[in-house]
Amino acid sequence: MSGEKRYLTAGLPGTGGTIKETADDFVVEEIPLYLPCGEGEHVYALIEKRGVTTLDAIRRLARALKLSERDVGYAGMKDARGVTRQTVSLPRMKPEEVLALELPGIRILSAERHRNKLKLGHLAGNRFRIRVRGVVSDAVARAEAILAVLERRGVPNRFGEQRYGAQGNSHLIGRAMLAGDWCAAVDLLMGDPAKVTGEAWRSAIEAYQRGELEESQRLFPGHCRTERDVIQRLVKRPDDFEGAFRAVNPRLRKLYLSACQSALFDHVVEARLDSLDTVQEGDLAWKHANGACFLVTDPAAEAPRAEHFEISPTGPLFGCRMMMPEGEEGALERSLLAAEGVEPASFDLPGGLRMEGERRPLRVPLGDPRASADADGLVLEFSLPKGSYATAVLREVMKGGRPD
């Protein structure tokens, strides 16, 4: 369903290699949308974190400063792997109080006042510095050739496999939810015994598959809280899969639906990979300057703007209110929905799960790319707009390595 197969730079050999062997191999720094003005009730703290997720960092900061976690603002989510530098906003604090903090895994690099709380999405993009180990001897030359193509034509704006969860099936759970197939949704949630680590976890899934619900509940490890909660409901009402699935946290249910959207989008990227840098009649084109979309009626007239990276074709993050393209591109997207057995109205779910949908550019610009070598391997530096993933670049550069 994800459709991630081909390379935009298929004619150029990759570097191979692996990433994230140490924290310093993967460094991400947010590019702010604006800088703190120097006055106001919020302190904008630039933090550097190692081996800590954004949400864990917020918990530690809130606890240390006696704040509610909800009061702490942030612009983007970052995972625990690697070194990340990002800004958080802290209300009713003095900069010197924040600078004095000493927390495991977190360094405070600066603290300045600003008037408003930092909101999700309030960033321009991210700058990456990534070391790839175990590459071929001419890796720098290979990487430079690939980066030059990506800089000219754009980076395929894939979500990639990291969007689909540890077992790679989050999007399938979302699809089952849209289809109202709650038995399938629960089966997928429980997982595949071949894809988990730990004998108890594996045995718990196998017990579920045999219909031994109480035994499965007993065997599931403590970190599998969602699975245990769902099975607890099934023990009481074995045929009520929809009711059992309601035990899943609403935020997690929304994540499954979002993963389904992402997989369908990635399928469109794959289908249109060869023409990512051109717009077709009926396309909904993306203006990179402001994120607005417009219907393309004269592709020849718009071609220079696409060539100069002012505009790009878009793909769907399907939803009940998403604008559909016309012509061949509209037919492609409608056929994709039909093949999955869903329609736009399927996304109009109750219980706060409604997905309105939006357009997303099929390609994004690659900012200031550089490739160099150090004693440990190949070093790649580049920037991407917010919402785009470094794995899309690494996949093209490494080709067959491990860009995760």
Swiss-Prot record:
One of its GO terms (molecular function) is tRNA pseudouridine(13) synthase activity. One of its GO terms (biological process) is tRNA pseudouridine synthesis. It is an enzyme of class 5 (isomerase). It catalyses: uridine(13) in tRNA = pseudouridine(13) in tRNA. Keywords: Isomerase, tRNA processing. Its EC number is 5.4.99.27. The active site is at D79 (nucleophile). The keyword Isomerase applies. PANTHER family: TRNA PSEUDOURIDINE SYNTHASE D. Belongs to the pseudouridine synthase TruD family. NCBIfam families: tRNA_TruD_broad. This is tRNA pseudouridine synthase D.
